[in-house]
Swiss-Prot record:
Protein's name in the database: Dolichyl-phosphate-mannose--protein mannosyltransferase 1
Pfam families recorded: MIR, PMT, PMT_4TMC
Residue spans crossing the bilayer: 29-49, 77-97, 124-144, 147-167, 170-190, 224-244, 258-278, 573-593, 610-630, 643-663, 671-691
Sequence similarity: Belongs to the glycosyltransferase 39 family.
Subcellular localization, as worded in the UniProt entry: Endoplasmic reticulum membrane; Nucleus membrane
Compositionally biased region (Low complexity): 807-823, 854-864
Pathway connected to this protein: Protein modification; protein glycosylation
Residues annotated as domain MIR: 310-364, 374-433, 443-499
Stored Gene3D superfamilies: 2.80.10.50
Organism this protein belongs to: Schizosaccharomyces pombe (strain 972 / ATCC 24843) (Fission yeast)
Any GO BP: protein O-linked mannosylation
Listed GO CC annotations: endomembrane system; endoplasmic reticulum; endoplasmic reticulum membrane; nuclear membrane
């Protein structure tokens, strides 16, 4: 009786029917399914394609991908941090709709598209891929739920999300990448529907299709690695369940394991390699992007000719020296001087070799600089690098560099000139790096192209280094070179690219760059992608933290013109529904886990089925969102779209579960579904002016700023809709530029110094002029030395003449003193005669006469002594006074 009543219970009967329905494998869509899918896809396309060329100008990162497509059409190499498939697809559209010889790259965002039919076709292609997300979402939800209502609801969420619509309207790589990720999820859902029939043809084809789709996703954008990780987790979960099923023999588990390895690892890698093979076949011509490639890869491109070079490097060789980091370029100098500090000649790096990148290797002792005596460079050789065009030597000293200005770095400069041998601060020691010199000979000598070495300053013990900084305008924005202590080896590694020595026999061994194979080029390209992805520029005004994405805290403005704007803005109803579901699912899992620990089992077959399928999409949401939390540079709101897609899939499966487990009345369930669809459509319409760049009033715009972090720049719009009809003001054009790209040169870096003329292929052409300048320099130095010696001799003669003139002046002064003393003596003698004749004053006169006579005698003696020995004026005067006194005394007597 109880058993019969149980089967008559409507809820229990519905549960049993549901479990049977979910366990039955679904072979194909029904006719009604196809009708629904086609209808929804057409609606999605119409929603995305309206006003597609509004604006008909370059928007945000369209510039990058449009130019990439043009480069592919012209068979030029391009470098990007993303794999090539998405750009190849854009180039295919451009090639089919445009003239190869008329397509040119564009300069900046906001620029008018020269050929609107090409741009329209490329945007239409993105629009088509965005529309195809709808049938993929429908199938992804339908296969695990068998619910048309839930699948349709999820598809409508994709159709009317403003963010997905916006990204589907522009030439950007996000939608192609998302399309292949969603294709991977779709085929995995098809595969899981075949679990009851393992190793059948449909089982193999669905798993193979999953691997192919995953390979295409990885070939479009590396963020598909998150999808790859998600599939590995699901495959491991399936294997774990098989291990727990004792009815499954071990050989079948091993077959499952090898099937997963082949289809989910081997097939994607094969597809990835195939895409790069197509890329290498199409992009075979040289371009500005090849500066980032290692030299052997760069010179393998058409248009980059490189002549054979002498293998042996000797003193007297004329060389160009290149840093091991490809984009850092060639050691260079010119007439530019540091504006402060030592004010010596600047040492820098340039992207392309030119005459100012030529150096001649001199011996540390000038008397050994004889090119006819060939002495090869080896490990430990001490050299002086002389700049060919200016004659100055590479130099370093205890001065901090102006730009880097670090204590562990010293300034590198060029010092001296032709005819100046230089000083000890010009000397550098060569240290060969054996591990990096893979293809060099093992005889310990320096070999062109193959030997990697350091240049170590002999006295400062610092290493010549390529800096990551650039000079400002006074240094023509060239890359700085310093001499550093304890720095990164890669920045201090150099090699000689061009080498010529007129003393070497013409039949001497010569070498050139070897041509790398496909796998080597593949590895190098991917290594550059991974490395450069870590150096994506200086950020952007609209980059945001991934923690804010699920709550849609900040819209991203793409474009503004004539009081109209384009924003990347998601549908708040869709985005908040997704994050609410994720939060609710986590809470339910915690609650069920707590009950399970208490001995309760809340998971029957149906509940477990839904819990697994909701959980797998929540895990996908987490894997496609959480890694961006660790990123701090160049992360934008639209990077959340893959996570949003999987969140919508989880939402669709959850809605099916609610319909089966909660709503006993199917009519109420479907009515509520219609209400949700209507609310979603209403919110889409409210924010559509930001999607399609249509008119909006200031007041309506402000009403849409529901959160404090939303800023729609509402003052951009006019006060009334009628004002747009009469407004002749075109307004200011505004566009957001993408952040600087690591594989794109800025305009500043393209500047060249004066004298940076192209380098002749035959370096021997520079030897005659070099020898002439050296000879002229030494002649000038000898002439300057002779002139200096003549100046020194003249100065010495002038000094001696000045001394003689001073002595003669002193003697003349002494003669005048003697004459004055004689006059005084005669006067005293006359006075003495007068005293002699006066009898009444004889005694007093005698005393005075004696004194006067003594003074006169002293003066006379001094005068005689001065004439004989040339005494000083003071002594002469004293002796003269004594002589005069003696004479006067004699006369008195």
């Amino acid at each position: 009786m109880d058993k019969q009543s149980t089967f008559q219970d409507p809820k229990e009967k519905h549960r049993i029917q549901r479990d049977v329905k979910l366990s039955r494998p679904r072979k194909r869509f029904s006719f009604l399914d196809y009708v629904v899918v086609i209808f929804l896809t057409v609606v999605a396309f119409c929603v995305r394609a309206q006003r597609l060329m509004n604006p008909a100008k370059v928007v945000f990162e369209e510039l990058r991908y449009y130019n990439y497509a043009v480069d592919y059409v012209n068979n030029k190499l391009l470098m990007d941090v993303y794999p090539p498939l998405g750009k190849l697809l854009f180039s295919l559209v451009a090639a089919l709709t445009g003239n190869k010889y008329e397509l040119n790259t564009l300069d900046e965002p906001g620029q008018q598209y020269p050929f609107t039919d090409v741009a329209y076709s490329m945007r239409l292609f993105t629009c088509l891929l965005g529309s195809l997300l709808v049938p993929l979402m429908y199938g992804t939800v339908y296969f695990p739920t068998k619910s048309k209502t839930a699948a349709s609801l999820a598809a409508l969420f994709v159709i009317f999300d403003n963010g997905l619509i916006t990204m589907s309207r522009y030439i950007m790589i996000e939608i192609p990448a998302l399309y292949f990720m969603s294709l991977t999820a779709f085929y995995w859902s098809v595969y899981e529907a075949q679990q009851k029939r393992p190793f059948s043809l449909r089982w193999h084809t669905s798993l193979l299709s999953t691997g192919v789709a995953l390979g295409l996703a990885l070939s479009t954008k590396l963020s598909a690695m998150f999808t790859f990780g998600w599939l590995l987790i699901l495959a491991a979960f399936h294997l774990w369940n098989l291990l727990g099923d004792l009815s499954v023999p071990m050989y079948r588990i091993v077959k499952h394991l090898f099937s997963y390895i082949f289809y989910l690892i081997g097939v994607p890698i094969t597809v990835y390699l195939a895409v790069f093979a197509v890329h290498s076949h199409i992009a075979y011509k040289a371009s500005v992007a090849d500066a980032f490639l290692p030299p052997e890869h760069r010179h393998a491109l058409a248009g980059n000719r490189f002549d054979d070079q002498f293998a042996d490097v000797a003193y007297g060789s004329l060389v160009t020296i290149r840093n091991a980091i490809p984009e850092h370029g060639y050691l260079h100098s010119s007439e530019l001087l540091y504006p402060e500090g030592t004010e010596q000649q600047i040492i820098s790096l340039v992207d392309e070799p030119n005459q100012n990148a030529l150096w001649i290797i001199e011996h540390e002792h000038s008397q050994d600089n004889n090119r006819s005596n060939i002495e090869l460079l080896k490990d430990g050789s001490v050299v002086r690098l002389r700049h060919v065009m200016t004659g100055r030597a590479l130099h370093s000293h205890e001065h901090k560099p102006i730009v880097s200005n670090n204590d562990w770095q010293l300034e590198a400069s060029a010092y001296g000139g032709f005819g100046f041998e230089g000083d000890a601060n010009d000397l550098f020691r060569i240290q060969i790096l054996e591990k990096k010199s893979k293809h060099a000979t093992s005889n310990g000598t320096v070999e062109t192209l193959n030997t990697k070495f350091r240049l170590i300053h002999v006295f400062a013990n610092c290493e010549l280094m390529s800096s990551h900084r650039r000079f400002p305008d006074w240094g023509d924005y060239q890359r700085e070179v310093t001499c550093c202590r304890n720095c990164v080896e890669r920045s201090t590694t150099w090699f000689i690219e061009s080498n010529y020595h007129d003393g070497l026999p013409s039949d001497s061994r010569k070498i050139t760059y070897r041509k790398p194979g496909f796998l080597e080029s593949f590895v190098e390209h991917n290594k550059l992608m991974w490395l450069k992805d870590r150096k994506m520029g200086d950020g952007h005004v609209y980059e945001s933290s991934a923690l804010t994405w699920p709550l849609l805290l900040g819209p991203l403005r793409f474009f503004y013109e004539q009081h109209l704007q384009v924003f990347f803005m998601g549908n708040p109803f869709v985005w908040y529904s997704v994050i609410s579901l994720v939060a609710f699912f986590v809470i339910v899992q915690i609650f069920c886990l707590a009950r399970w620990n208490l001995g309760y089992n809340d998971f029957g077959p149906s509940a477990f089925h839904y819990n697994y399928n909701i959980g797998k999409f929540v895990v996908a949401w987490l894997l496609h969102w959480a890694p961006y939390i660790l990123e701090t540079d160049r992360v934008f709101l639209y990077h959340y779209l893959p996570a949003l897609y999987f969140g919508i899939a989880a939402l669709g499966v959850s809605w099916s579960f609610l319909g089966n487990a909660v709503f006993g009345n199917r009519t109420a369930y479907k009515a509520l579904s219609v209400i949700i669809m209507a609310l979603m459509f209403l919110v889409y319409r409210l924010y559509s002016p930001f999607t399609y760049m249509t008119t909006l009033t200031k007041s309506s715009c402000r009403a849409l700023e529901l959160k404090g972090s939303w800023n729609f720049h509402c003052n951009t719009y006019l006060d009334n809709l009628s004002d747009y009809k009469f407004s002749s003001d075109a307004g200011e054009t505004y566009f957001e530029k993408a952040a600087p790209h690591p594989f794109v040169y800025s305009e500043d870096t393209a500047k060249k110094s004066e004298g940076d003329t192209p380098l002749n292929k035959n370096l021997n052409d520079y030897y005659p002029s070099w020898d002439q300048r050296v000879e002229a320099g030494y002649k000038l130095a000898a002439q300057q030395k002779a002139e200096q010696e003549a100046r020194e001799a003249a100065e010495k003669a002038a000094s001696e003449a000045a001394e003689r003139s001073s002595s003669e002046a002193a003697a003349s002064s002494s003669s005048e003193s003697v004459a004055a003393a004689s006059v005084e003596a005669e006067r005293l003698a006359m006075e003495a005669d007068e005293f002699n004749g006066a009898s009444e004053t004889v005694d007093g006169a005698s005393v005075e006469a004696e004194r006067s006579a003594m003074e006169a005698a002293a003066l006379n003696n001094a005068a005689e002594s001065t004439e004989v020995v040339g005494s000083s004026p003071e002594s002469v005067a004293s002796e003269q006074e004594e002589n005069v006194a003696e004479s006067a005394q004699a006369r008195v007597e």
